[in-house]
């Protein structure tokens, strides 16, 4: 459980760093307003805010996020979020029932685009 919580906290820091050091990422988030959360079925999670070109997060869940990613448990969440081939891991998790998505799917796709900025320079997103 601690690894999952730490990974969600670290995700915030990685997104903040990408916004600060990558002008294309900064432009991607500059006018975006989004609230989402990543959690387990048991209720452990973190909610994230993207507003005014900034990314922030807090431990715990909120009532009405624009979308939610729910993992079966913390171990599955950690394994999927930290997988080298995240796209395949996400698709497999959805297929296997280890991950469910709810809320605004347009915002989920936008967030997927944001995570592309976390990839090392020169790594293909396709």
Predicted regions and their residues:
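Feature captures hydrophobic
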Residues: 1-126
């Amino acid at each position: 459980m601690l690894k999952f919580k730490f990974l969600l906290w670290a995700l915030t820091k990685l997104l903040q760093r990408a916004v600060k050091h990558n002008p294309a990422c900064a432009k991607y988030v500059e006018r975006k307003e989004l609230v989402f959360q990543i959690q387990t079925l048991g209720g452990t999670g973190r909610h994230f805010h993207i507003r005014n070109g900034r990314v922030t997060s807090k431990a715990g869940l909120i009532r009405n996020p624009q979308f939610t990613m729910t993992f079966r448990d913390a171990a599955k969440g950690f394994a999927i979020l930290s997988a080298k081939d995240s796209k395949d891991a996400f698709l497999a998790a959805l297929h296997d029932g280890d991950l469910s998505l709810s809320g605004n799917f347009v915002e989920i796709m936008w967030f997927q685009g944001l995570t592309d900025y976390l990839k090392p320079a020169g790594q293909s997103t396709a």
